[in-house]
Amino acid sequence: MLSRSEGQQALEAASEIIGSKGVNRETLAHAYYLRGNAYRQNGNVRMALNSYLESMELDPDGPAAEAYRHIQELLDFYNKDYYNP
């Protein structure tokens, strides 16, 4: 697990790559995936899911698809009563 400062550094580095021009799709998809991981480790699940979705648009078979699925499964389990009153 990353420390808070390491997580912030990871977010900044990934966001810098995402904001750069001329980055290839594979690198961009990986940057979104890494940013999603940093958000998740910082407790910001919503932003993590958004970053994973961005990555999946660029690389549907990349690691973000599995990370997204895992978070969704956890949320479904955690919110089971919300969906099944």
Indicate residue ranges for each PLM-predicted region.
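Alpha-helical linker/edge segments of TPR/alpha-solenoid repeat scaffolds
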Residues: 6, 72-85
